[in-house]
Amino acid sequence: MVRDGAKAPPHHEGEKLIEDCKVERFTMNFDDTPQEAAFRAEARKWVDANAPKQYEAELSKASLGRIKLENEEIVDVGKAWQKKKAEGGWACLHWPKEYGGRGATPIERVIWQQEEGVYGKLTQPFQIGEGMCGPTVMAYGNEEHKRHYLPKLASGEQIWCQLFSEPAGGSDVAGLRTRAEKRGEDWIINGQKIWTSGAHYSDYGLLITRTDPNVPKHKGLTMFFLDMKSRGVEVRPIKQANGMQEFNEVYFTDVVIPDHQRLGAVGDGWNVSLTTLMNERMSIGARLATGFPEMFEFCANLMTDDGLAIDDRATRSKLASWAVKASGLKYTSYRAISALSKGERPGPENSIGKLVAGSMLQDIAMYAMDLEGAAGVFTGAAEEEARGQFQQMLLSSPSMRIAGGTDEILRNIIAERVLGLPGDIRVDKDVPFNKIPTKGR
């Protein structure tokens, strides 16, 4: 968001950032520092000069960042934008310069997201690589890994995916069954992953496997990265209810991964995965969608039998409630940003934010369709008023309550880390993985 009195270009979506944390963690200043104001001006100038403005109108109507450009493939357009950002020094801002980034502060990163606006949706194919896989490679890879792979990820030359969830191990990541067996200097991988976003267009993947079934489930895991074009890797896109194919099943049959593509020690995969999962929640939280801006605009323009929707008392009451939640989410995220700006680790802010935003998104989509009446049943019939964005939002919103941690997992985090309640009873604690009862055994 721009400072008071300044005019923002139409693609700016953000609110003014709470910039600088003063004295205490929860004392926050709304204004840009001189350095941040200069950074914002530089970013705005570059975006105005380089953004692919032919896509602005379509991007502004894309619900949840689910982009489906009419005439061009999103991956190709995204790669072109990512490459241009890398050439201009605006890709993966928070990464070190030697790995393709800019060494920017957390607040500068948020300022950039505000100034990039709707064009940030074009980089959707790179969000997992930048926000989750890249930081994991940075933390556990050797220097050769970092200098070879990270600049290519930052420039858009490579796309990465995250291979964690399995048919019998979604929220319980440590319950995974994909096996990795050591043979000489290589590892042989067999198993299956599911709900892998972007696997069908990814070049590399971050893969967590089970290397020792004779120890408790969290202790027998090992992390690797692999070429998604490796022999024995089969990717099957999953057709979704909204007509898109963002997720995939991935099968591994005697896939060979050299030991030098291991991240972390053998058996330490759980600790490595915590780095990935922590960055996943932060990545999701950075661009948390609520549907409120779209809903407010929709109600302000939708004419019903009784007049404008926004003039209806019941609708105004709902909008007021959502506005309060949206404001709370904004300031909760600012708290996390303030902590990061001081070098602190954020608390449970992203869990709280995702939990509230996910349910809010679903509620808004359902109410919008109620307002549309009969037109809400068919995407095409509503195109004139809302371009079908709320129908797409309703079909996609359940996934937002699952990806990056289900509502139940997030409530457990809040209960245990914020309220200090005792953790769930775990009957499999300290039990070797191969001794845990399963169906058919």
Where are the regions that the model predicts?
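A cross-taxon signal for low-complexity, glycine/charged-rich
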Residues: 3-20
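Amphipathic, small/basic residue-rich leader segments at the start of a protein or domain
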Residues: 21-127, 148-155, 284-285, 300-301, ...
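Internal helix-loop-helix
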Residues: 78-157, 197-204, 326, 340-348, ...
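Alpha-helix capping/hinge segments and adjacent helical runs
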Residues: 49, 53, 86, 90, ...
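A short core secondary-structure module
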Residues: 177, 185-186, 190-236
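Glycine-rich beta->alpha junctions and the first turn(s) of the following alpha-helix
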Residues: 30-34, 39, 233-331, 339, ...
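A short, Trp-centered hydrophobic/proline-enriched beta-strand micro-motif
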Residues: 156-164
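C-terminal helix-coil-helix/basic helical segment that borders enzyme active sites and/or dimer interfaces
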Residues: 56-63, 304, 313, 327-383
